[in-house]
Amino acid sequence: MSQVPAYKRILLKLSGEALMGDDSYGINRTTIEQIVGQIKEVVELGVEVGVVIGGGNIFRGVAPAAAGMDRATADYMGMMATVMNALALKDAMTKAGLIARVQSALTMQQIAEPYVRGKAMQYLEEGKVVIFAAGTGNPFFTTDTAAALRGMEMNVDIMLKATKVDGVYTDDPKKNPDAVRYQSVTFDEAISRNLKVMDATAFALCRDQHLNIKVFSIFKNGALRRVVLGEDEGTLVHC
């Protein structure tokens, strides 16, 4: 099998929940090390990697207190949770021998650089992993939308949406054992079949700007490497 990557630059979208492992909330150290190990594999192939991280694993712990809270305030809390995850991810990357930088859409100069497009692109070209934190920096936008936005700004070849399921299925594979994984599906087909790939705003951005999406499971050993090498892993959503 060829070891030449199918993509030169990728944007990896990680949900905060992916960092929980089997825990009910928070960050599972073993899980984050496993994810970083997969990222290291593709960096060593010469692939430039940007990461957008969610914050659900941390925000879940304070969600009861946020019930009834002003939506914008709750969203800002969620953004700060993504910064915590980004710092944990960077720490694990550093320990694994990777060079990583955190850029935040919210100004937190003591712990993260502000998001600057040109600087982020320079880091990618230098082989550094760039972790984009705090979503878009605006309430009412999800981290899926932030991933679509950063992916376009970084001129990535593809957006990789890492989930707990190894692709997009005809039905929920946990409930229906006869559900079949799509190898590929167009944006229009995904809409007509009501397939839940990501939130509507992010999906529309990717479709309109012709940014393909690959949905795969980050919990399958070596899955990220196989995706980057262009192997049959996950589901490709394309124009």
Swiss-Prot record:
Specify whether Kinase is a keyword of the entry. yes
Known role: Catalyzes the reversible phosphorylation of UMP to UDP.
Activity regulation summary: Inhibited by UTP.
What pathway is it annotated to? Pyrimidine metabolism; CTP biosynthesis via de novo pathway; UDP from UMP (UMPK route): step 1/1
The enzyme's first-digit EC class, named in words, is: transferase
Query: Which Gene3D superfamilies does the record associate with it?
Result: Acetylglutamate kinase-like
GO molecular function annotations of the record: ATP binding; UMP kinase activity
Q: What reaction is this protein's catalytic activity?
A: UMP + ATP = UDP + ADP
What family name appears in the similarity comment? Belongs to the UMP kinase family.
Q: Which residues bind UMP?
A: G55, D75, T136, G137, N138, P139, F140, F141, T142, T143
Q: Which UniProt keywords apply?
A: ATP-binding, Cytoplasm, Kinase, Nucleotide-binding, Pyrimidine biosynthesis, Transferase
List the EC numbers from the record: 2.7.4.22
The name of this protein is: Uridylate kinase
* Any GO CC annotation of this UniProt entry: cytosol
| Organism for this UniProt entry | Chromobacterium violaceum (strain ATCC 12472 / DSM 30191 / JCM 1249 / CCUG 213 / NBRC 12614 / NCIMB 9131 / NCTC 9757 / MK)
**Which of this chain's residues are annotated to bind ATP?**
K13, L14, S15, G16, G56, R60, T163, Y169, D172
Q: Which coarse location class describes where this protein primarily resides?
A: cytoplasm
